[in-house]
Regions:
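Non-catalytic terminal extensions of ATP-dependent helicases
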Residues: 1-194
Length: 194
């Protein structure tokens, strides 16, 4: 694959860098004959990657974020002799869940912002962290596997999580994301026709 030729239509430098990383992972997967993964991509990057890969008819990849409606996903590039079923059996090799269980007095205190803020405050890269599923009693933080131990060790250094129980779980053990629906009635005046 000629990287420069494939990227010529993209103007933004960030887009080129993101797609260049994806091309590199796909090439490494082909030449080495093994699975390669990117860091987490945000929703824009996921959309960009999907359109780029479809346009260039590249099929040996899977976008995965830990659960069906995840916003942040990794791109898993695999050799031609692998199937998606073979990849699905190995998801736990790519992603882990760092589970934070709060104490009784801390339950309900923290939002997504608090968890993400803590990770950023520790100086850890956002690209290594996927979705953060927040619940009343804590959160499940999806991370790339090699990052799980680091996060488990560093989170208790933050005052807000010093009394929390922090464990590393398999990606299959992630809690279901709670979807809250609120009905709102809005009355809108319309212009009179008379």
């Amino acid at each position: 694959m000629d990287k420069q030729q494939l990227l010529r239509d993209y103007k933004k430098q960030e887009d080129k860098m993101c797609l260049a990383q994806i091309i590199d992972k796909i090439e490494m997967s082909r030449t080495r004959g093994k699975i390669e993964c990117t860091d987490f991509l945000d929703m824009y990057q996921v959309s960009l990657a999907e359109s780029f890969l479809k346009k260039n008819q590249i099929q040996n990849y899977k976008l995965y974020g830990g659960y069906p409606d995840s916003e942040r996903k990794i791109l898993i590039a695999y050799p031609e002799n692998y199937t998606e079923e073979m990849i699905a059996k190995n998801y736990s090799k790519f992603l882990k869940v760092v589970k934070i269980e709060l104490t009784e007095e801390d339950k309900g205190k923290f939002t997504h912002r608090n968890y993400l803020g803590g990770i950023v405050k520790l100086g850890l890269k956002r690209e290594k962290v996927g979705d953060i599923v927040v619940a009343e009693d804590g959160a499940d933080i999806i991370v790339v596997s090699e990052f799980a131990e680091i996060l488990k060790k560093e989170l208790p250094t933050l005052t807000r999580f010093e009394n929390a129980t922090i464990t590393i779980n398999e990606i299959t053990e992630i809690r279901k994301k709670e979807i809250k629906i609120e009905n709102i009635e809005i009355i809108v005046p319309s212009l009179r026709m008379d």
